[in-house]
Amino acid sequence: MFRAMMKLLNRTAAQVPTRKGSGGWRKPVDSPHMTLVGAYGSPYSIKMRAVLRYRRIPHRWVVRNSSEDQGFPEAPVPIIPVLVFHDGENGYSESMVDSSPQIMRLETDYSERSLLPTDPVVRFLDHLVEDYGDEWLTKVMYHYRWHHLYGEAIAKAGNMLPLMSDNQMDAEQHRAINEFITDRQMGRTALVGSTDLNRDVIEGSFVRLLTLLEDHLSQHQFLLGGRPARGDFGLFGQFSQLFFWEPDSSLIAAKCSPRSMIWAYQIDDLSSFEVDETKDWFTRDGLPSTLSALLCEIGRTYAPFLIANERALTAQESELICSIEGNEYRQTPFPYQLKCLNWIREAFGQLHEGDRKAVEQLLDGTGCELLLADPHG
């Protein structure tokens, strides 16, 4: 029973999947190029599945801990999704984790239907939007799934998550795992910032985002113009849970931004979308005010969080504290978010001088300009 409970921990936003052995299924010669191992309740898994669909990369979708989840090479760290690359024969060459590096690896291996805007300035903004989706919106997703005030959402997640890998699970086992995973995930809410103190910040950011997206999507098909980019999939991953799974947040979304909900359904499978070169990404000189509004939202929420997280980790403090929209925000600092901040700075530093100046001008006054400052300068 305990082993079964432990296997179910990976099917949430903060999953820690168990590792499978080396035996079992072997790839047929004529199978797809790669296998994506993930879970329906994992926003990053659904994000990567949508990326593979849009890019029309032949792949196999396998649910973690299902009967098909056998024989894959050990991932670098025990998280999902895992992207397993086939070796062209009857086995595998490697596996990798973390959705953003996975996307960039695919950009190296496949040139068609790229997600990288051609304008390096817009490409940097896309990086920023994807990171916001991955690292800030995940707090919103976790909040609407596990915060103690959302009883229906908790009950739904507790009932459905255990069945993802085995829909024929017996009732006694299902009940025990339901209780185990619910208790564990509710106990982790404070670690990701979902507390009573932070509730107004998290929920306010969700409503503001929906409102500005309703305006943007009334004029533009994607976040950065006429074709999708990384940022579209970064937001979609979290929206796949907030819109399609969580009862409370889905009602809020339907009320505040029906266009966002339809957009998310579209992003889930863009395999039929034909790229029109005449409807490309925005350029630095043609960014609409609706995109500036999104950057301002990132600047008022995610940017102060990242800076406070960096300061807390540098000072070896057990709690980060910052002000977001006039409200005090507190949570445990996380080293991974410091890596995210450093990656943003590295991407900015790799731009040519003229492009850096263009980024600085575009971000001036949004709040995001704080992320570009050299902490040692």
Regions found by a protein language model. Give the residues of each.
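Short N-terminal edge-element motif at the start of the domain
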Residues: 189-225
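GST superfamily/GST-like fold recognition
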Residues: 223-243
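Active-site/pore-lining binding-face segments in mid-to-C-terminal subdomains
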Residues: 236-328
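Alpha-helical packing segments of well-folded alpha/beta enzyme cores
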Residues: 44, 48, 202-209, 213-216, ...
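Inter-helical turn/loop segments and adjacent helix faces that build the functional surface
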Residues: 107-114, 192-197, 219-224, 246-252
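Intrinsically disordered, low-structural-confidence terminal and linker regions
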Residues: 2-19
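GST-like domain detector, emphasizing the conserved glutathione-binding G-site
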Residues: 17-172, 223, 243, 292, ...
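Divalent-metal (Mg2+/Mn2+/Ca2+)-assisted nucleotide/phosphate chemistry catalytic cores
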Residues: 150-203
